[in-house]
């Protein structure tokens, strides 16, 4: 029973993450605008994903517990390029991508570096959610922000809480997923709220 639940959580998470950012990317491409999206939020999310993936690889955790992160990073990079493209300058993305790539190698130079980065990872990821919330509160417009993407993110956090408890039982990772679940739900509700407000205004 436990093995079946673990398998379901792992594979459903991978399946969801394979398409997680596609609704958001599609919305941006269809609107030909990144209106409502927060660039700081996306950059912080990318940093959080990178640190988390490096930490899992460094400590040799089971690949099925983190295989979605390369997929998520690739989708976030595509979204980042879309934002810069529709804001008028794709070349501005180059320094950000260079920093992310070099960080992958720097993080594993010393054990204390990766441990410190992982301890900060929860704050980085939480900051990314708050940056998106702040953008929504400021504009009072969800724009092209995809509620589906954020609700799917909530699902993956919930499944990763289960898989963490059943495999590594790493408290740092568990705490991160609990906080991310709460914040993802908050962003989803906020997006839906401002979408309803916009529909009523029309």
Curated annotation (Swiss-Prot):
It is found in: Membrane. Its main location: membrane. The chain crosses the membrane at residues 33-53, 64-84, 97-117, 171-191. Keywords: Membrane, Signal, Transmembrane, Transmembrane helix. It is a multi-pass membrane protein. Residues 1-19 form the signal peptide. Coiled coil: none annotated. GO terms for cellular component: membrane. The keyword Membrane applies. This is Solute carrier family 66 member 3. The lineage of its organism: Eukaryota, Metazoa, Chordata, Craniata, Vertebrata. The gene is SLC66A3.
């Amino acid at each position: 029973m436990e093995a079946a639940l673990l398998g379901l959580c792992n594979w459903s998470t991978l399946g969801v993450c394979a398409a997680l950012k596609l609704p958001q990317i599609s919305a941006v491409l269809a609107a030909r605008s990144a209106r409502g999206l927060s660039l700081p939020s996306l950059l912080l999310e990318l940093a959080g994903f990178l640190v988390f993936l490096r930490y899992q690889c460094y400590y040799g955790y089971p690949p099925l517990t983190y295989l979605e992160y390369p997929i998520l990073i690739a989708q976030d990079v595509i979204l980042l390029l879309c934002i810069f493209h529709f804001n008028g300058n794709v070349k501005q993305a180059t320094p950000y991508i260079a920093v992310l790539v070099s960080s992958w190698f720097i993080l594993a130079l010393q054990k204390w570096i990766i441990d410190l980065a992982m301890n900060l990872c929860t704050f980085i990821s939480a900051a990314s959610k708050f940056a998106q919330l702040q953008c929504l509160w400021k504009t009072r417009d969800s724009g092209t922000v995809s509620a589906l993407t954020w609700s799917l993110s909530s699902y993956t956090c919930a499944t990763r809480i289960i898989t963490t408890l059943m495999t590594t039982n790493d408290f740092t990772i568990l705490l991160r997923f609990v906080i991310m679940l709460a914040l993802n739900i908050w962003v989803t509700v906020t997006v839906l709220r401002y979408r309803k407000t916009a529909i009523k205004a029309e």
